[in-house]
């Protein structure tokens, strides 16, 4: 199985266009040693030719341009994207579908709740129906694994996660199973398993067992502290209110990952305020000590 990190930042990317927090300002003036990052999206393949796109970020055009296998050049109009999975209906995970309209129809896998959001509050399915058939919906059943013809050697298993629907959603304050999912992706040939959850608000005992049975954990790295947005003076909501488990503190992501010594551990969906973006920070050094990696645009993983 091939996993390509197309984008590794949270919504807004890094540096965020309108932000002058210590990270964004430091990156712009050159005083901060860090890498620019686009908004979160990955691609998965069983052969390196045909790819399943997981989330379509607003930065999708630049992301595809930077990864040559996404343009195999077999015809005058071509793409390596064989299917698209939407983990949720967040703006920063779905807006890229608009930029992919020239390639419609696209096979899109998502839950009932995500499809509902993208047919009402942010009606992408209706909007894109005017482009060569638009988006062909394939329902993700929460209690069933599924396969995708573009990558027949991979099995996808959805995991309903405790998180939050987007601010535009008609049920923003009425959460439902399927608002946000994680994925177990298993290579049926090698047995390798990827656990992918860019939006993870809580890890309970059953989910921890699932993570322990995986080989690579690609998990929510949004915030270092739960009140980070407040500390940085750029927001009022906590990580938990936004559906993101912070790395630091009791019950935080690092405490969870400490219980999983065998797995390769990688943080993704990193907010522009997170001090781990600073490669010289104490927080980044703590991740190195714990053998927890920080995803970056262009990172490749094989398992």
UniProtKB/Swiss-Prot annotation:
The keyword rRNA-binding does not apply. The keyword Transferase does not apply. Pathway: Cofactor biosynthesis; pyrroloquinoline quinone biosynthesis. InterPro entries: Metallo-B-lactamas, PQQ_synth_PqqB, RibonucZ/Hydroxyglut_hydro. Keywords: PQQ biosynthesis, Transport. It comes from the Bacteria. Gene3D superfamilies: Ribonuclease Z/Hydroxyacylglutathione hydrolase-like (3.60.15.10). GO terms for biological process: pyrroloquinoline quinone biosynthetic process. May be involved in the transport of PQQ or its precursor to the periplasm. NCBIfam families: PQQ_syn_pqqB. PANTHER family: COENZYME PQQ SYNTHESIS PROTEIN B (PTHR42663:SF7), HYDROLASE C777.06C-RELATED-RELATED (PTHR42663). HAMAP family: PQQ_syn_PqqB. Belongs to the PqqB family. This is Coenzyme PQQ synthesis protein B. The gene is pqqB.
């Amino acid at each position: 199985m091939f996993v390509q990190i197309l984008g590794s930042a949270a919504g807004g990317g890094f540096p965020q266009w309108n932000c002058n927090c210590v990270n964004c300002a430091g990156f712009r003036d050159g005083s901060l040693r860090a890498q620019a990052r686009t908004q979160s999206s990955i691609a998965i393949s069983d052969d390196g030719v045909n790819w399943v796109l997981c989330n379509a970020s607003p930065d999708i055009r630049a992301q595809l341009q930077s990864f040559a296998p996404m343009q195999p050049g077999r015809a005058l109009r071509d793409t390596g994207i064989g299917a698209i999975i939407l983990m949720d209906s967040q703006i920063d995970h779905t807006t890229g579908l608009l930029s992919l309209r020239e390639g419609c129809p696209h096979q899109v896998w998502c839950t009932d709740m995500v499809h509902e959001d993208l047919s009402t509050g942010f009606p992408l399915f209706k909007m894109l129906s005017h482009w060569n058939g638009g988006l062909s919906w394939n329902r993700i059943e929460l209690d069933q694994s599924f396969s995708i013809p573009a990558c027949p050697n991979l099995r996808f298993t959805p995991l309903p996660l405790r998180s939050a629907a987007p601010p535009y959603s008609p049920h923003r304050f009425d959460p439902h199973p399927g608002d946000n999912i994680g994925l177990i992706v298993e290579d049926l040939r090698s047995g390798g398993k990827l656990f992918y959850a860019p939006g993870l608000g809580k890890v309970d005992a059953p989910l921890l067992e699932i993570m322990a049975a995986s080989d690579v954990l690609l998990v929510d790295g949004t915030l270092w502290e739960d009140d980070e947005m407040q500390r940085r003076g750029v927001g009022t909501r906590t990580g938990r209110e936004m559906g993101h488990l912070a790395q630091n503190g009791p019950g935080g992501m690092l405490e969870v990952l400490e219980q999983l010594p065998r797995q390769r551990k990688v943080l993704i969906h990193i907010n522009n305020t997170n001090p781990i973006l600073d490669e010289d920070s104490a927080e980044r050094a703590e991740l190195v000590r714990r053998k927890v990696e920080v995803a970056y645009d262009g990172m490749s993983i094989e398992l």
